[in-house]
């Protein structure tokens, strides 16, 4: 059995895990197109309430009874095969589609699909691009992996041919997409619970590039050797950017006291515009250049680019300011890969704080084990590290790796590091060791943010 989104408007679609960031956006697009939508989630949330208001039938908890008069069931990689709704869908011979395949179906209904790929920076860059597209009145449909203030959440349903989405490489999910413009920000070893090695990852990105039609475009980071290697297979138009290389470059870069950059953008030797960003870090200078490349492709004028990028203050959980208490600043960041952590700490170091205390929660046993040596070396820019237990996410603890082992190695490397085993223990350390003018930085993709929230409250 198959499902064609453009023809099967009478089909009723059910989402398992509808409250998730990615699934909720897909559900909203369908509701706007006139589909009957239902979905289940483990708990009620702002997202499920918003979807209910828009006409979705929401079930809290998973049960075979939730599949009432349903034709298509959509699920994510996080849903186990013994989920009662998956079992019921198979028993009833319903159409079962994973999230990536279903998103690909939605993309078929748009001409100008923009897919933002890369190991790091997808959410921030997708958000930047969304700001520029909205500033240019393109009326895009947007699916982003974090909450974005300008669209009041993680999705926006537009009424144009423009569709902007993140493209995650995990389990090769982005190979189900239909991009007209692909963007590759960077390529590093990650998701090694699925990929064999970096060559396997590069081969998958090459397949992504081959998806783009001959009249389409691939935008790539010319400062990243692995990206440039991948772009060699392109049969479509190629546009590159970088701080030091590429068709589009940033020059005359200066940072203010908040770590945010002002710079000039050149295409070859022609100055296109000057930009002042409202998000910190050199990595965001690079990310913003990919948005300029896209603007060049879609003939967006300089005023809209400047307006869009200068108005972007960051996506939630991406170097997000959480508050200040006793003149101690609290910032939360989603970084969970050594490259991301180094970029986050480098950004923090450009700000004028007396001391940087980083509370880090490793994310998944596989990532911690496979990138162990990189994790040991990525905290050099913090003054003190508070290391929490590994956040398991979708994995089981096989007893092969733990945070105490990582902490020992980090201490041997010369970084002041303290292991803690609960949010409360982390809070005790923070309360005892931070003083006026310091920065508390919570880092990770799990629930480490609670430490900063406990401190502020």
From Swiss-Prot:
Q: Where in the cell is it found?
A: Cytoplasm
Principal localization reads cytoplasm
What Pfam families does UniProt report for this protein, alphabetically?
Mur_ligase, Mur_ligase_C, Mur_ligase_M
Instruction: State the reactions this protein catalyses.
Output: UDP-N-acetyl-alpha-D-muramate + L-alanine + ATP = UDP-N-acetyl-alpha-D-muramoyl-L-alanine + ADP + phosphate + H(+)
User: Mind telling me which InterPro entries this protein's record contains?
Assistant: Mur-like_cat_sf (IPR036565), Mur_ligase_C (IPR004101), Mur_ligase_C_dom_sf (IPR036615), Mur_ligase_cen (IPR013221), Mur_ligase_N (IPR000713), MurCDEF_pg_biosynth (IPR050061), UDP-N-AcMur_Ala_ligase_MurC (IPR005758)
What Enzyme Commission number(s) appear in the record? 6.3.2.8
Superkingdom of the source species:
Bacteria
Which GO terms are recorded in the biological process aspect for this UniProt protein? Answer: cell division; cell wall organization; peptidoglycan biosynthetic process; regulation of cell shape
> Per UniProt, which keywords does this protein have?
ATP-binding, Cell cycle, Cell division, Cell shape, Cell wall biogenesis/degradation, Cytoplasm, Ligase, Nucleotide-binding, Peptidoglycan synthesis
Kind of enzyme, top EC level?
ligase
The family classification in the record reads: Belongs to the MurCDEF family.
Q: What does this protein do?
A: Cell wall formation.
Q: What is this protein called?
A: UDP-N-acetylmuramate--L-alanine ligase
Organism of origin is: Clostridium perfringens (strain ATCC 13124 / DSM 756 / JCM 1290 / NCIMB 6125 / NCTC 8237 / Type A)
